[in-house]
Regions:
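Solvent-exposed N-terminal domain segments of exported/luminal and surface proteins
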Residues: 1-137
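Conserved small/polar residues in nucleotide/adenosyl-binding loops
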Residues: 204-211
């Protein structure tokens, strides 16, 4: 267990947008979309569970990022296989040529490429994440490297199977929760102290073997 640090900081523009959201942002389409929303953190003073989930979905994540991800798929006998991804993520506000008049319902753009094992390497998932996914479902495409074909991927949502997870993860499991909130009833159940995977930089940067982290 690592000690907690207040290691998050936000740009002044994001803090100002958050102040404006506190006054102006409201939910539309039965809670499935946002109106008058700027940049990040739509409900800085959340009143219910749905507003808390929207704060998670639309939180500030640095504008854009690129990361390497390792996914383990464990089996009942304790064996497991590893899949390696390169992921790229960009919020619309980080794009200088973003045209809100054409894609006003887009929240961010996401690309995930499998780099290993070789049987999956080169497969790519591309997502245009929409704010109101009941009004306009998430736009997703899959490139199959073996077939050299691109197909639309409407199954990449809700409880559709997660990439290369052998059915052990759903699409909306990624990032704790993602996508439209309409299929759940969100409630605040109070607060309790828990351990969370945060401030674990020594673990992330260590040379610990995979077996020791199972």
């Amino acid at each position: 267990v690592y000690p907690t640090h207040r290691s998050a900081s936000l740009p002044a523009a994001v803090l100002e947008a958050t102040k404006q959201n506190a006054v102006n942002t409201r939910m539309v389409s039965g809670g499935n979309g946002l109106e008058n929303f700027q940049t990040a953190n739509p409900f800085p003073i959340p009143k219910d569970g749905l507003e808390v989930i929207w704060n998670h979905i639309a939180r500030y994540r640095g504008g854009s990022m690129r990361r390497l991800v390792t996914q383990a798929t464990p089996q009942p006998n304790g064996s497991y296989s590893l899949v390696y991804f390169q992921e790229e993520f960009t919020f619309r506000d980080a794009l200088t040529d973003f045209d809100a008049s054409k894609e006003s319902n887009v929240l961010f753009y996401f690309k995930q490429r499998v780099t290993a094992p070789s049987r999956l390497a080169g497969n790519v998932l591309l997502v245009h994440e929409t704010l109101d996914q009941v009004k306009e479902p998430r736009l997703a495409w899959l490139y199959n490297a073996g077939q050299r074909r691109v197909r639309r991927a409407p199954q990449v949502s809700y409880d559709g199977p997660g990439t290369a997870a052998d059915g052990l993860r759903t699409s909306d499991n990624l990032d704790m929760y993602n996508g439209a909130p309409d299929r759940y009833d969100w409630k605040l159940e109070g607060k309790k102290e828990i351990y969370i995977p945060y401030n674990a930089c020594l673990l992330y940067t260590s040379d610990a073997a995979d077996d020791s982290l199972r």
